[in-house]
Amino acid sequence: HHDRGFNPVEVITFDPAAVLGQLIESLPNAHFAVEKADGSYLFHRHFPAYALGDNNIETPLDELVKHQVSRVVVLSPEQEVEEFLDVVARIGLHTVSYAIGYTAWLDISPLGVTKSSALEKIRLQHGIKADQVIAIGDGRNDINMFEWAQAGGGIGFAMGQGPEEVQAAASIVTSSVEDDGVARVLSGFEGILFTR
């Protein structure tokens, strides 16, 4: 186990073999990675340095299916996003939850496990009112989180560099990462004391 700067409260894993088999067949030139329960990654083919953190090991493709994992990541840099979306839609990933990033990037998690399902657990555990939720994101995998926040009366903020459909799903669009969008959102709430 390594220091990630946080302690997981719950890690939900699944067997990635079936879904990886479908993806490898349909996207033979893609790059694949799996996140193990301890937060480390195994990957096949290069991933950007920022994507997997420091604890990652390059491994043969067949090694990826041998572990229970909390996430499968697929990167297909040679494809346009629309083409990638079409391939993923044709595969029909019905036994897992998945979200497409703002490039040809796919995150796959156990069925029913999403950012919003995890955040709802945290919200309930800490007694936070639904209308006090602030969700900030920039990728297609954040749309479900915005919908969850807004359904409870909270606010979804899209980062300025996010794709149009992500911005359209949010309550408000803030500045880009480069222009300190998150800091601008948080400074707008400075001095507000939320009560339970």
Write out the residue ranges for each language-model feature.
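Mg2+-dependent phosphoryl-transfer enzymes with acidic/Ser/Thr/Gly-rich catalytic loops
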Residues: 109-196
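Short acidic-hydrophobic, aromatic-tinged amphipathic segments that line or gate anion-handling sites
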Residues: 10-12, 56-59, 157, 173-177
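Structural recognition of alpha->loop->beta junctions
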Residues: 1-4, 65-66, 167-173
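Conserved acidic, metal-coordinating active-site core of Asp-based
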Residues: 18-136, 140-145
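A generic secondary-structure micro-motif detector
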Residues: 9-10, 74, 109, 152
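Glycine/small-residue-rich loop that forms an oxyanion/phosphate-binding "nest" at active or ligand-binding sites
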Residues: 1-17
